[in-house]
Swiss-Prot record:
Alphabetical list of InterPro entries matching this protein: Gfo/Idh/MocA-like_OxRdtase_C, Gfo/Idh/MocA-like_OxRdtase_N, Gfo/Idh/MocA_oxidoreduct, NAD(P)-bd_dom_sf
Protein name from the UniProt record: Uncharacterized oxidoreductase YfiI
Gene3D superfamilies: Dihydrodipicolinate Reductase, domain 2, NAD(P)-binding Rossmann-like Domain
Annotated source species: Bacillus subtilis (strain 168)
Primary enzyme class: oxidoreductase
Entry-linked Pfam families: GFO_IDH_MocA, GFO_IDH_MocA_C
Gene Ontology MF annotations: nucleotide binding; oxidoreductase activity
Gene this chain is encoded by: yfiI
Similarity section: Belongs to the Gfo/Idh/MocA family.
Signal sequence coordinates: none
Length: 393
């Protein structure tokens, strides 16, 4: 059965945003994701911009009541808590260094949270927020937007069904060339903060890019755990040091498999080098973000196959997220809508204390966010010690 916008939860969740304003690169992706299924979320408030007047003007143009366009998140949480129809969930679409304080304030105000990645600077902060969320009975979701591509669930099903055999090699890549020079930092505030350690944290592309692909690999292969890794990172544009614009990571998994991750913003000429290839003892499967509706399945000694999204031969877990049918292409907008719909289902289940749904729903939750921080921490630790093998802690 295809998703068609019908009600899946009892009523739309009253939703707000912190950040994601007129000048934001990512804010529109959040709104596309949340509002694609208009029975799941309703945008009712926001602190959209560090410039309060610009944020208010933007919010009004989105259809938000002027009185609920707030100058900052502190005021929003305080004022919304006084209302009978106050917000129930907030999305945090701000620079990395602000995530922790906003997330903590939201939970203390009794509001569910959906947050940009990387979640926080340290895994210790992640554990603290996880404990607070559990105490308050709230959900924290993380917007690993690419993970909403349903062909990734097809990969997961094929691996679980033994269709590629034992996993031997994991080949991960997320690269582009848009930061091959420092011109972006000169004209874009969003790019400038990404290479500022005080705002971005301990990494650039490891946090900004590779966390997406790392989570996707976990989604596809939930039983695969990294035993140790080695990270070599570079700042080819020197002004970005100590943050990296290129990194290679080697991985040893607990089952004996090996893996690689190449993440880069200086892959000159590359528009979208985002791919995952899993090599098994029987066959290999591969997915490219530039062709999100297709999955390559190659059995040793047989002609290669291209599996296409929306077709009845795919697993039910994949087709459960189908929206447009195989005749039409789906892409990033649908992927974001898929994860936002799962956030809504998780929040609704949490509100109703429906543990069965929560235990069976696959979505990027706070544990996924903490695991992404651990990935960054271990990569940076290896690189800073001279690119040595380190235990994955």
């Amino acid at each position: 059965m295809m998703l068609n916008g019908e009600r899946i939860i009892s009523k739309p969740l009253r939703w707000a945003m912190v950040g994601g304003g007129r000048l934001s690169q990512v804010g529109y992706k959040h709104r596309i994701g949340a509002l694609r299924d208009n029975t799941a979320f309703q945008l009712t408030a926001g602190a959209f911009d560090i410039d309060a007047e610009r944020g208010k003007d933007f919010g009004v143009n989105l259809g938000v009541d002027a009185e609920r366009c707030y100058p900052n998140y502190q005021t929003m949480f305080a004022e919304e808590a006084k209302r009978q129809d106050g917000i129930e969930v907030v999305s945090i679409a701000t620079p990395n260094g602000t995530h922790y304080e906003i997330c903590k304030a939201a939970l203390e105000a009794g509001v569910h949270v959906i947050c940009e990645k990387p979640l926080f600077f340290t895994s210790a902060e992640g554990q603290e927020i996880k404990a607070l969320a559990e105490k308050k009975g709230k959900i924290v979701g993380v917007t690993y937007g690419f993970s909403g591509n349903q062909m990734l669930l097809q990969m997961r099903a094929m691996i679980e069904q033994g269709m590629i055999g034992d996993i031997r090699v994991v080949d991960l890549q997320y690269t582009h060339g848009f930061c091959a020079t420092d011109e972006g930092e000169k004209i874009s505030a969003a790019q400038k903060w990404r290479v500022d350690p005080a705002i971005a944290g301990p990494s650039f592309v490891l946090g900004d890019l590779s966390t997406h692909t790392y989570y996707m690999s976990q989604l596809i292969m939930p039983k695969m755990k990294i035993k140790e890794l080695l990270c070599d990172r570079q700042s080819f544009v020197g002004s970005r040091a100590p943050l990296e614009d290129n990194a290679h990571v080697l991985m040893h998994y607990e089952n004996g498999a090996v893996g690689t991750m190449w993440t880069s913003s200086i892959n000159a000429g590359c528009m979208d080098g985002h791919r995952i290839r899993i090599v098994g003892s029987k066959a290999s499967i591969e997915w490219w973000d530039s062709k999100p509706n297709e999955l390559t399945y190659e059995v040793q000694g047989e002609p290669g196959q291209t599996l296409v999204r929306g077709m009845p031969y795919l697993d039910d877990v994949c087709n459960a997220d189908e929206r447009l049918g195989a005749l039409h292409s789906e892409g990033l907008s649908e992927a974001w809508a898929n994860i936002y719909l799962k956030f809504a289902i998780a929040i609704d289940a949490k509100n109703r204390e429906d543990e069965e749904i929560l235990n069976n729903l696959v979505y990027p939750d706070i544990d996924a966010g903490i695991e992404g921080i651990r990935w960054i921490e271990n990569c940076v630790r290896s690189a800073n010690q001279g690119s040595v093998w380190v235990e994955f802690k």
